[in-house]
């Protein structure tokens, strides 16, 4: 075996006979898997190699190597299936468990990068530290069986149809990278830089994207449930045809984001910034959008049933077919908004602000509107709002005006009083 201290130990797969003796590579019979295992040639298991393992475990180690040898011998035309790969990997994990304390017992695989930066992860098991040599990166295994890419520069890398579950990309530079058809369950991207990255048809459930920089990135047809995106920078990101159930976007910066056909019940967007964003065909049922900045956003075909929107800002926002039934929208700000075919029935709109709004077929049936302030722009046509409710809203508003000034208000100074109420509510929100 080629051996240099503890830095490079390759396990041979075809060079041990059934009597545990060591044979020379020149006398080793070629197998159908030679093409696949050609990077193992000129390696031997000898006493020096076995000395890396506990003396009492030598027989076990040799037995495991023989089992792997038989698997390789049975491979047709040098090909290896994912199922066979997993079996072999299990043997090597078992081998590593017998390494003595002098060894660095991290099991790694070799990641080959071709000239187009496409990745092929081969089954090369050895005990080694992370190294970068020529165009090959030695990637150590994580404790959970994934790969440790942490803090590497992988700009423009293309990874397709790989199992990267439990891998670690923390602090990685992944600008313009592409992950397609990959299993990335429980993968860690904490603090990764990934502008213009593409995740296409990937499994990202239970992963960690906290504090990433993902400007202009794309999630397309992904499953990203129970994912942590808190404090993430995702402005101008595109998220479409994706599941985000129970994911956490606490204080995420998502200005100008484009969300299309997203299923995200129970999502947490508390204090997130989605200003100037476009949201269409979104299921935010039972979501938390409290204190979210949606100023100058466009919201169409949104399900916000039974959601929380405390102190949410929707000024100068266009809303069409937004369903907020049974939602709690206390202190929400709709100033200068345009609402069309929206439903607020049975919702809590206590102290909501609706100054200078445009309404078209908006439903406030059975809504709680105590303390609401509302002024509708004159000259608007097709205002289909229940007249009794509108009178009630205006009555509540005028009563609130009186409590702020100590006297009833005329129409001339109504707007000035409304602005004072707004300032008071803003102070309460802070």
From Swiss-Prot:
InterPro entries: 5peptide_repeat (IPR001646), Pentapeptide-BTB/POZ_domain (IPR051082). This is Uncharacterized protein YjcF. It comes from Escherichia coli (strain K12). The gene is yjcF.
